[in-house]
Every structure is written in structure tokens, then in C-alpha cells.
Amino acid sequence: MSQFPLSILKTSQPHHQPKSMNAPRSSDARGKRILIDPIDDRISKLPDDVLVMILASLSTEDALKTSVLSTRWKNVWKQVPYLHFDLLSATYESGLIAALSNSVAESITQVINNHNGHLMGCSIHHFAHHCVNGVLENWIRLLTLEKNTRFLSLCNKLGKGRRTNVLRFSPNTFSHPKLATLFLRRYDLVTAHAFKECENLKILKLEGILAEVDVFNTVIASCPSLKVLVLNCMWYNEKTCLKIHNNNLKVLHLDCPHVDCIDVSAALLDIFSIFYFAFAKEQNFVIKAPRLLFNNWTKDLEKVPNMNYNITSHAQEKKNIGHEFVVSGDASYLQKLKSLKVVVDVTNSREVHMLRDILVAWNGVLEELHILFKDNNVPNSKEDSESSIGGTQKKKWEEANLFPNADFRVEVMWMFDFNGSNKKQFALASRFVTQGTVMKKMMIKTSSFFANEKLDNEAVVAKLKELPKGNENLSIECF
């Protein structure tokens, strides 16, 4: 099971939009009951845990419908680990949205109350008026205090104008020790009270959030255990500095236009991405993140939305929570980025696998890919070594296996610390040439080497130029 099941909830929905739980049945369904011949009903003979796995792949509404199949199925849905409610998918008559959506909201409350045991995750898409009538806060209370929900995603239908989606929650609303992941979308935050003492949160994603910069600073400071932080925010006051000081942070994404100043200090930050910013002064953007080896921040900010990822550093972690988040559907910003800079040791099979993951997740054409090669001379794990001996590592570069896949393309590729004598580095570069992965230009830095090494690398570059090119107009150059 993915570490981020809320993404799975989205992808497990049927291709058609489900009807509201209160929507009328079609004419051919009225008055009919679904009957199952007990002789042929082999599925019902399966144990509960298997049936729960089957229901977990359905939408919550479809899982609920199985309760009418037979007494055997009546309570099975109550054990599913994830719930997903979308009030926006229902069809409402004009002028009756509030009344009808409140009726659906009551049904949601009933479903949560009737569910047995704890929940791994829950997502709710609701209307703005649920923010002010106590319904949303009641859902959160039920999900955190009674269901011990670990993953919670709340999305509000955009209200009409400023201050229409205000979250006014009690202090410590999100501080339940079991709550580890929180996604909030389209809200106004007046205070940070709900985040008081949120040492429990490991992942926080704030999208379309409107608040004072000082409120954001308080929220971030109240969550010292964060490993993943995504900010897509707007503010009322621009002339204030956004401060992100966190020594546990692994992933940081910033999409906060018009802020006057950003101050980041994150000793363990491995993955940093940012959208366009236009600071009045270069000094208005300060980042202290020693693991990020590409540090031309001023030029990057003026260029394109980009990501900086130290794969070598992140691969040393026992749990790659940052990597898993970025390659999941929850990092919805990924494909909007235009440039990727990675640090990777291609002799390490785990790092190669992580490189493949991030490129596949991009799923399209990247404007620029920068690769800083590392040669750590650190032996792989026993599992990696055995797979390399058995040929698994070799298969990554075989012609029958496209790397990373058939869809990924990059217009311009830059290589730093390229060692021509390293067979794995040469194999990767040659695959990108022959597959047509690089569309316009491949740039290989040789100027930083000593004279004899420079000549050796330039000779290797000459070999790359002789390879059959997947793109005839590809230019391969040294710099």
C-alpha cells in the first residue's frame, strides 16, 4: 500500500462521476433489489479481510452500496481503511445547494459514525458554508479523535470573495498524535490556532490558502517534525518575510508569488522546488540547505520553475518519504516544473531506480535536465549487489528497456563531473543519445578537469557523437 493513500483514493474512482448519496435512482432501478444466488456467490465466501481489500478499490459510495447485497455484506464496508466524500460531484437544483448539500453532509456524518475501527485516510470535498456552520469542524473531530485518521485531505469549493472560506477552529484541532498527513485546499486562515503544538504532522500541503505571512510563519513553526512542506499560498501583506526554519524537512515546494522575502534554513533538505519569484533584491531570498549542491538560486529564480534533488543524499535514508511523496500523484505541481537538477551515483542501483522514478513521474517534455554525477565508491546493499551480479542492474541499460520510459523527453541536458572512464555514466549518456531522449542539445562539462582527464573525457564525448542519434538534429558539445 502506498504511503500516500489519498492519491490512491483519487485514482480508484470510477471513470464516471458517482451520483450523490441522496440522488434518486434511475427508473429501471426503482423498486428492484440486487439479488445474489447463494449457490453461485463464491465471493461472499471469502474472509472479511479479502472482501475489505476489494471494497477498498471502490469509491466510498460504491462500497456502501454493497451493504444491500446480503446479510454477509451488510457490515463489511465499515472496515475499509479509506473514505472519500465529494459533495461537489452531486447534482443540485438551482437555489437549493445549501439545503441539499447539508442533507448530504448529514449522510457523511452518519457514514463516519457507522464506520468500525480506525481509518488510514479520509478526503472530503465540501462547500464554503460548511466552514461556518460547524459541520467541517465536527467531521475533523470525528476523524481525528474517534477514528484516529492518519491522512486527512480537506478541499473547499471556492467561495465568493475574500473571507468566505475562513477556518475558525479550536486550538490544537490538527494536533492529534495519530494525524501525520494534512492537505488543505482553498481556505482563509485568520489565525494559526488550529495548528498549535502540531508535532505530530510529518506532511503538510497547503494549496490556495490565503493568510497573513505571520500566520504562515506561526503554522510552520508549530510543526517542527515536518518532512514534507508544500506551500501554494497568497497573502494580504507582501512586505513581510516568510520564514521556514526546520531541521527535519526533506521536501520543500514553494509557489507563493509576490512575497517580499523568503528565509529558508533546512539542514536535511534534499528536494527543493520553486515557481517564479521576482525579488526586489538578491538578498531577499536566503536559503541554507547544505545538501542542495546546485546553488545558483538567483539565476534559477529568474529562469523557469525548477526542482533541485540530491538523490545521492536522499537514498541514504532508511525511509524515502520525500521521494515517495514527489513521485506520487499528491505532488500535483511536478509536471508544471520546467527544469530538474539531480545529484546521482549511477553505479548505485537504488539511486538509478530513484532517478527512473522521478523522470517517469514527469511524464512529458522537460526543458532542462542537469545531472551532477557522484562516484561515492560506497558498495550497494547486499540485495543490490546480488541483483547486479544476477544482471538486474545491467538490464537497466539493455536496448530492450527504455530508460526511463518511452514518454520522457528533455530538450537540453547538462552533465557535470562526467567521468568518461565510468562505464555506467557512459551507458546512461549513450542511451539518452540513441533513444532520442535528448531532443536538442547535450552539454558535457570538461573544463573543470586536469589536462589529461580533460583529453580523456573529450575523447569519450567524441564517441558519443559517433553513436546513431535518436534525434538527427541533436548537438553534443563540451563546455
UniProtKB/Swiss-Prot annotation:
<dbReference type="Pfam" id="PF00646">
    <property type="entry name" value="F-box"/>
</dbReference>
<protein>
    <recommendedName>
        <fullName>Putative F-box protein At1g67390</fullName>
    </recommendedName>
</protein>
<dbReference type="InterPro" id="IPR044997">
    <property type="entry name" value="F-box_plant"/>
</dbReference>
<dbReference type="InterPro" id="IPR055411">
    <property type="entry name" value="LRR_FXL15/At3g58940/PEG3-like"/>
</dbReference>
<dbReference type="InterPro" id="IPR032675">
    <property type="entry name" value="LRR_dom_sf"/>
</dbReference>
<feature type="domain" description="F-box">
    <location>
        <begin position="40"/>
        <end position="88"/>
    </location>
</feature>
<dbReference type="InterPro" id="IPR001810">
    <property type="entry name" value="F-box_dom"/>
</dbReference>
<dbReference type="Pfam" id="PF24758">
    <property type="entry name" value="LRR_At5g56370"/>
</dbReference>
<dbReference type="InterPro" id="IPR053781">
    <property type="entry name" value="F-box_AtFBL13-like"/>
</dbReference>
<dbReference type="InterPro" id="IPR036047">
    <property type="entry name" value="F-box-like_dom_sf"/>
</dbReference>
